[in-house]
Protein backbone atom coordinates (compact mmCIF):
# COMPACT_ATOMS: atom_id res chain seq x y z
CA UNK A 1 0.00 0.00 0.00
CA UNK A 2 2.86 2.35 0.80
CA UNK A 3 4.50 1.68 -2.55
CA UNK A 4 1.30 2.51 -4.42
CA UNK A 5 0.85 5.72 -2.44
CA UNK A 6 4.46 6.73 -3.02
CA UNK A 7 4.18 5.97 -6.74
CA UNK A 8 1.01 8.05 -7.08
CA UNK A 9 2.52 10.97 -5.18
CA UNK A 10 5.65 10.80 -7.32
CA UNK A 11 3.57 10.70 -10.50
CA UNK A 12 1.51 13.70 -9.37
CA UNK A 13 4.64 15.60 -8.36
CA UNK A 14 6.40 15.02 -11.67
CA UNK A 15 3.43 16.23 -13.67
CA UNK A 16 3.17 19.33 -11.46
CA UNK A 17 6.84 20.09 -12.04
CA UNK A 18 6.42 19.68 -15.78
CA UNK A 19 3.36 21.97 -15.78
CA UNK A 20 5.29 24.81 -14.10
CA UNK A 21 8.00 24.95 -16.74
CA UNK A 22 9.48 28.49 -16.59
CA UNK A 23 11.04 28.08 -20.04
CA UNK A 24 7.77 27.36 -21.83
CA UNK A 25 7.53 28.33 -25.46
CA UNK A 26 5.03 31.18 -25.78
CA UNK A 27 4.45 30.30 -29.44
CA UNK A 28 3.16 26.87 -28.45
CA UNK A 29 -0.61 26.57 -29.20
CA UNK A 30 -1.12 24.98 -25.76
CA UNK A 31 0.47 27.88 -23.87
CA UNK A 32 -2.05 29.86 -21.81
CA UNK A 33 -1.67 33.21 -20.14
CA UNK A 34 -3.21 32.14 -16.84
CA UNK A 35 -3.18 35.57 -15.18
CA UNK A 36 -5.21 37.20 -17.95
CA UNK A 37 -7.50 34.19 -18.10
CA UNK A 38 -8.12 34.40 -14.35
CA UNK A 39 -8.67 38.16 -14.47
CA UNK A 40 -11.15 37.94 -17.33
CA UNK A 41 -12.99 35.13 -15.54
CA UNK A 42 -13.27 37.21 -12.37
CA UNK A 43 -14.54 40.21 -14.33
CA UNK A 44 -17.10 38.08 -16.18
CA UNK A 45 -18.24 36.46 -12.92
CA UNK A 46 -18.55 39.83 -11.21
CA UNK A 47 -20.61 41.27 -14.05
CA UNK A 48 -22.93 38.26 -14.03
CA UNK A 49 -23.34 38.53 -10.25
CA UNK A 50 -24.18 42.23 -10.49
CA UNK A 51 -26.67 41.54 -13.30
CA UNK A 52 -28.31 38.81 -11.22
CA UNK A 53 -28.61 41.02 -8.15
CA UNK A 54 -30.02 43.85 -10.28
CA UNK A 55 -32.61 41.49 -11.81
CA UNK A 56 -33.72 40.26 -8.39
CA UNK A 57 -33.91 43.74 -6.87
CA UNK A 58 -35.69 45.29 -9.86
CA UNK A 59 -38.91 43.44 -9.05
CA UNK A 60 -39.65 42.60 -12.67
CA UNK A 61 -38.96 38.90 -12.16
CA UNK A 62 -41.83 37.82 -9.95
CA UNK A 63 -43.38 34.41 -9.61
CA UNK A 64 -46.85 34.21 -11.05
CA UNK A 65 -49.08 32.68 -8.42
CA UNK A 66 -52.49 31.30 -9.17
CA UNK A 67 -55.62 32.35 -7.31
CA UNK A 68 -55.79 29.05 -5.43
CA UNK A 69 -53.11 28.56 -2.83
CA UNK A 70 -51.55 25.11 -2.94
CA UNK A 71 -50.59 23.56 0.36
CA UNK A 72 -47.29 21.70 0.44
CA UNK A 73 -48.91 18.69 2.16
CA UNK A 74 -51.89 16.96 0.54
CA UNK A 75 -55.08 16.76 2.56
CA UNK A 76 -54.95 12.98 2.91
CA UNK A 77 -51.30 12.16 3.26
CA UNK A 78 -50.37 8.50 3.03
CA UNK A 79 -47.94 7.60 5.82
CA UNK A 80 -44.71 6.21 4.45
CA UNK A 81 -43.85 4.36 7.63
CA UNK A 82 -46.61 2.24 9.05
CA UNK A 83 -46.57 0.40 12.37
CA UNK A 84 -44.84 -2.94 11.99
CA UNK A 85 -43.11 -2.06 8.71
CA UNK A 86 -39.73 -1.41 10.31
CA UNK A 87 -37.39 -4.38 10.58
CA UNK A 88 -34.35 -4.98 12.67
CA UNK A 89 -31.49 -6.29 10.61
Swiss-Prot record:
GO terms for cellular component: basolateral plasma membrane; plasma membrane; sodium:potassium-exchanging ATPase complex. It is a single-pass type I membrane protein. Disulfide bonds: none annotated. GO terms for biological process: positive regulation of sodium ion export across plasma membrane; potassium ion transmembrane transport; sodium ion transport. The keyword Signal applies. Residues 21-38 are extracellular. Residues 60-89 are cytoplasmic. The keyword DNA damage does not apply. One of its GO terms (molecular function) is sodium channel regulator activity. Its main location: membrane. The chain crosses the membrane at residues 39-59. Residues 1-20 form the signal peptide. It is found in: Cell membrane; Basolateral cell membrane. Keywords: Cell membrane, Ion transport, Membrane, Potassium, Potassium transport, Signal, Sodium, Sodium transport, Sodium/potassium transport, Transmembrane, Transmembrane helix, Transport. Gene3D superfamilies: Single helix bin. Regulatory subunit of the sodium/potassium-transporting ATPase which is composed of a catalytic alpha subunit, a non-catalytic beta subunit and a regulatory subunit. The regulatory subunit, a member of the FXYD protein family, modulates the enzymatic activity in a tissue- and isoform-specific way by changing affinities of the Na+/K+-ATPase toward Na(+), K(+) or ATP. PANTHER family: FXYD DOMAIN-CONTAINING ION TRANSPORT REGULATOR 4 (PTHR14132:SF10), SODIUM/POTASSIUM-TRANSPORTING ATPASE SUBUNIT GAMMA (PTHR14132). Associates with and regulates the activity of the sodium/potassium-transporting ATPase (NKA) which catalyzes the hydrolysis of ATP coupled with the exchange of Na(+) and K(+) ions across the plasma membrane. Increases the apparent affinity of the transporter for Na(+) and increases NKA activity. This is FXYD domain-containing ion transport regulator 4.
